[in-house]
A protein has these predicted regions:
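Sec-dependent signal peptide recognition
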Residues: 2-8
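C-terminal motif of bacterial Sec signal peptides marking the signal peptidase cleavage site
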Residues: 14-16
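Hydrophobic faces of well-ordered beta-strands that scaffold small-molecule active sites
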Residues: 36-40, 69-71, 122-124, 193, ...
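Soluble or luminal CAZymes and related metallo-dependent hydrolases
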Residues: 50-53, 103-107, 173-177, 201, ...
Length: 379
C-alpha cells in the first residue's frame, strides 16, 4: 500500500505542472470539485435489488469517503423489444415514475432522505436521448415527438439498441415535457444528473434545462456521458475521460482492442507509456480549462458488463490505475458497484445478479480499505 501511494504521489508531482493551477471557488454547501462519485447499481448491489436494501448500505459508502451517489436509471422499463428478462435500465416508459422492481416512490424518498441525513448527495441517471418503444409518450399518440423511420412508420433505432425509440429535439412540446420531468426530480430533492449519451442531445436544450434546474437548486452536480468540449459550454460540470480510460487499458496490456460502448465499433489502441499519459494530461488541460471536471474511472456499468472487469483489462496494475483516478489534474474519481469489494466478474445487465458474495470477506475488506484510503487521500 505504501509503495502504491508513493508511486501515485510521484506521478501526481510529475504531471502537476501540466494541471491548471487556477483555484476554483468552492460552494459552501457542496464542494463538488473534490467529490468522489459512486455508481450504485440498485439491481445488483444487494440480493433484494431494492431501494430499501441499498439504503442499508449508504452508511458504508459514507464511511468509505463517498460524496456523490449516482443511481443508474430508476424509472419503469419498457416491454416492447425488452432485452433479457428484466430489461435495460436505459429503456424508459415514464420519466416521472419508479421502476417497481426497485420499490415505490415512498421507498425512493426514504432512500434519498437517509442519504441526505448522512451528508451524501444523490444524482440519478437521465436518459434524454430516447424512451422505450412502448413509452407513455408513444402510447399517447405523440408520434411527432420521435425521429421516425419512414420505411417502418416506427421510431428509429440507434446502434444496436432495439428496445429504444429516438426522441426528436426539433419538437418544442417534447422539449418542454422533458424539461418538466427534469425539474420534477430536482424539486423532490435529487442533487443532479448523470446524462446518458449526452452528446446525442442538442447543446441548446441542455443549456436551457440547466438554467432552469439551477434556478431550483444552484448546487446541482451535472455529469455528461461524453467528452465533447461543447458539453461544458452547455453547462455540464463534468464529462467522461474516455480517452484516458483507454490509455490506462493500453498501458496495462501493451496495446489492446477496446469496444466503444457508444456503438462506433471496435477501435485499436496502440501500446501506451507514461509519456503518453503525461502528453494526454497536458492536452486535456488545454482542451478542458478549469473549472471543467473530468470523470476518471477504471470501471463503470458499461465497461464491467461488456468490456470486462478492471482485473481483466488491467491485470495486476488495476489498483495503480485506480489510484491515478484520484490524483490526476481535474479528475473526479468514480467507483462502480462491486469495485470496493474487489469483484472480479462481469455483472449481468438484463438479469438479476448480485455482488454480495464478497461483502463480508477479508478479501472484500481489503479492497474497501484500499478505496477508503484513496478517498481520504483525495479529501
Amino acid at each position: 500500500m505504501k509503495r502504491l501511494f508513493a508511486l501515485v504521489a510521484l506521478v501526481a508531482t510529475l504531471v502537476g505542472c501540466a494541471g491548471n493551477s487556477e483555484k476554483v471557488a468552492e460552494s459552501p454547501a457542496f464542494d463538488k470539485y473534490n467529490s468522489v462519485v459512486y455508481e450504485l447499481n440498485i439491481r445488483q448491489a444487494t440480493e433484494e435489488g431494492t431501494f430499501a436494501a441499498a439504503e442499508a448500505y449508504l452508511p458504508v459508502l459514507k464511511d468509505m469517503g463517498v460524496d456523490i451517489v449516482w443511481l443508474m436509471p430508476i424509472s419503469p422499463i419498457g416491454v416492447d423489444g425488452r432485452k433479457g428478462t428484466l430489461g435495460s435500465y436505459y429503456s424508459i416508459i415514464d420519466y416521472k415514475a419508479i421502476n417497481p422492481e426497485f420499490g415505490t416512490m415512498e421507498d425512493f424518498d426514504k432512500f434519498l432522505a437517509t442519504a441526505h441525513d448522512l451528508g451524501l448527495k444523490v444524482i440519478i441517471d437521465w436518459v434524454a436521448n430516447h424512451t422505450s418503444r412502448d413509452a407513455n409518450w408513444w402510447k399517447e399518440g405523440k408520434k411527432d415527438w420521435y425521429v421516425m423511420d419512414e420505411a417502418t412508420g416506427l421510431p428509429i433505432v440507434e446502434y444496436d439498441w432495439t428496445d429504444i425509440a429516438k426522441l426528436d429535439y426539433k419538437n418544442e412540446d417534447m422539449r418542454a415535457a422533458m424539461l418538466d420531468a427534469l425539474k420534477f426530480w430536482i424539486e423532490k430533492g435529487v442533487d443532479g444528473y448523470r446524462c446518458d449519451v449526452a452528446m446525442n442531445v442538442p447543446g441548446d436544450f441542455w443549456k436551457r434545462a440547466w438554467e432552469e434546474v439551477r434556478a431550483i437548486n444552484p448546487d446541482v452536480y451535472l455529469l455528461a456521458e461524453g467528452e465533447e468540449t461543447w458539453l461544458h459550454d452547455s453547462d455540464f460540470d463534468a464529462t467522461y475521460a474516455w480517452e484516458l480510460h483507454h490509455i490506462f487499458n493500453a498501458m496495462a496490456k501493451g496495446g489492446s482492442e477496446t469496444k466503444n460502448v457508444a456503438g462506433d465499433g471496435t477501435i485499436k489502441t496502440d501500446a501506451k507509456s507514461v509519456q503518453d499519459l503525461k502528453d494526454y494530461i497536458a492536452r486535456d488541460d488545454e482542451k478542458y480549462p478549469a473549472p471543467a471536471m473530468r470523470l476518471m474511472f477504471t470501471s463503470n456499468h458499461d465497461e464491467n458488463s461488456w468490456a470486462g472487469t478492471e482485473m481483466e483489462r488491467m491485470g495486476d496494475a488495476h489498483k495503480t490505475f485506480a489510484a491515478l483516478t484520484f490524483v490526476l489534474p481535474k479528475g473526479q474519481p468514480l467507483i462502480y458497484t462491486g469495485q470496493e469489494i474487489g469483484l472480479n466478474r462481469r455483472l449481468q445487465f438484463f438479469e438479476k445478479d448480485s455482488v454480495v458474495e464478497l461483502v463480508d470477506t477479508e478479501y472484500g475488506k481489503e479492497y474497501r480499505d484500499f478505496y477508503k484510503a484513496l478517498c481520504a487521500f483525495r479529501h
